[in-house]
Amino acid sequence: MLWFKNLMVYRLSREISLRAEEMEKQLASMAFTPCGSQDMAKMGWVPPMGSHSDALTHVANGQIVICARKEEKILPSPVIKQALEAKIAKLEAEQARKLKKTEKDSLKDEVLHSLLPRAFSRFSQTMMWIDTVNGLIMVDCASAKKAEDTLALLRKSLGSLPVVPLSMENPIELTLTEWVRSGSAAQGFQLLDEAELKSLLEDGGVIRAKKQDLTSEEITNHIEAGKVVTKLALDWQQRIQFVMCDDGSLKRLKFCDELRDQNEDIDREDFAQRFDADFILMTGELAALIQNLIEGLGGEAQR
């Protein structure tokens, strides 16, 4: 099932048409195809329901989920270096002279092309959820680079995608710091036992607290000394636990058992019905969480 593990959240900066029927055709033009013999990497769209459906989009209640797959050829540097050195040595022996740097650089490209067809592939998939009701796009990944790559693929598929990272009116780290300092988060949220604190100075230290009482004197002292909270583990209404980061991303989402088991009455053999029910449940909960979070963090920055 598609329960998201992380959320990189983006705001559509202006209204655009995002209808699943249109998107289906647009994504099909950039459907995933495997790497050819000389490709280092390929990225494209695959059905979010895997082998259970050919559709590249799945939609329910104005929520759309899509899935990008990436194939990357793995060529370890030592392998390239060894093959290159062997080729250079062979040519220098044959020609009885030292090769120039430009010649060596050209040889490196030749070596890469000769090794590529034999290289192993690494595959990864990234889910993306488009909330057309609230004008948000969420990417299930932990790095901004991966999220931007997936958004770039969608932008290329649609022709236009005006999005910006979701940002708050007040710096997130200052709000998180105040929550820890006061020992109380915004309504609906509860502090857990994990945080990261950073000094505002460039060469200042980083403190990572795990399984620790965040209201303790030790943590308070770090804040008084000028450190700010850049990551904070939170519980939302005893339904979802996550780590809030100062860049606006949510990491390590953990849905409570009660939530995950809510659709257990649906026959697991009926994959499509279960997928649909879980998708509706997950997006409904996460949309409410995001809205609560925006309010709790002091509101979204004016655009």
From Swiss-Prot:
Gene Ontology biological process terms, A to Z = DNA recombination; regulation of DNA recombination
MF annotations from Gene Ontology: double-stranded DNA binding; single-stranded DNA binding
Where is this protein found?
Cytoplasm, Nucleoid
What is the predominant subcellular site recorded for this chain?
Answer: cytoplasm
The GO cellular component terms are: bacterial nucleoid; cytosol
Asked if the keyword Aminoacyl-tRNA synthetase belongs to this entry, the reply reads no
Description of the deletion phenotype: A double deletion with priB is disadvantageous to cells, which accumulate DNA double-strand breaks.
Q: Which family does it belong to?
A: Belongs to the RdgC family.
What function does the entry list?
A: May be involved in recombination. Genetic interactions among priB, dam, lexA, nagC, polA, rdgB, rdgB, rep and uup link the PriA-PriB replication restart pathway to DNA double-strand break repair.
Q: What is this protein called?
A: Recombination-associated protein RdgC
